[in-house]
Amino acid sequence: MSYSLKTIEEHFVPYSIAKKYIKELIDTGSSSNLIQKTFDYLNSISRCDEDSASKIMKELEEIVKREDVRAVLASICPTTVEEVRSVLVIDPSTIYSTEQIQKIIEIIKKYVES
């Protein structure tokens, strides 16, 4: 089976949203061993559902400008200052205050699965 795809837009997405898209591929029969293994891996590491990840991404927009950084935060859902700081180093051009980091943690904790 051969597909011809054209990329119209490109976005960074959290793990749980990627998992949703891969599940759609599997459900339509467009699966392979690699796709199945990727789905299984994402299923094992997702910390929140796709709706919660989308909400985290949206709420973080006012604090974290870069989409790639928001996607990593919504994927791994860090809950300590140190964990958040370890992600924020991805964007060395922005300095985040302790207050901003605490707000990031509050947003994530609203949606993270226990």
Swiss-Prot record:
- Which reaction is catalysed here? RNA(n) + a ribonucleoside 5'-triphosphate = RNA(n+1) + diphosphate
Q: Which Pfam families is this protein grouped with? A: RNA_pol_Rpb4
Q: Name the Enzyme Commission number(s) assigned to this protein.
A: 2.7.7.6
Post-translational modification summary for this protein? In purified enzyme appears as 5 forms, each differing by about 200 Da of a covalently bound, negatively charged residue. Not glycosylated.
Q: Does the keyword Cytoplasm apply?
A: yes
Q: List the disulfide bonds.
A: none
Biological process annotations from GO:
DNA-templated transcription; DNA-templated transcription initiation
The UniProt keywords, alphabetically, are: Cytoplasm, DNA-directed RNA polymerase, Nucleotidyltransferase, Transcription, Transferase
| Annotated compartments | Cytoplasm
Q: Does the keyword Membrane apply?
A: no
List the InterPro entries: HRDC-like_sf, HRDC_dom_sf, Rpb4/RPC9, Rpo4
Query: What enzyme class is recorded for this protein?
Result: transferase
Q: Which GO terms describe its molecular function?
A: DNA-directed RNA polymerase activity; nucleotide binding
**GO cellular component labels:** cytoplasm; DNA-directed RNA polymerase complex
Biological function: DNA-dependent RNA polymerase catalyzes the transcription of DNA into RNA using the four ribonucleoside triphosphates as substrates. This subunit is less well bound than the others. Probably not involved in transcription initiation.
**Quaternary data:** Part of the 13-subunit RNA polymerase complex. Forms a stalk with Rpo7 that extends from the main structure.
Protein family membership: Belongs to the eukaryotic RPB4 RNA polymerase subunit family.
Q: What is this protein called?
A: DNA-directed RNA polymerase subunit Rpo4
Q: Which gene encodes it?
A: rpo4
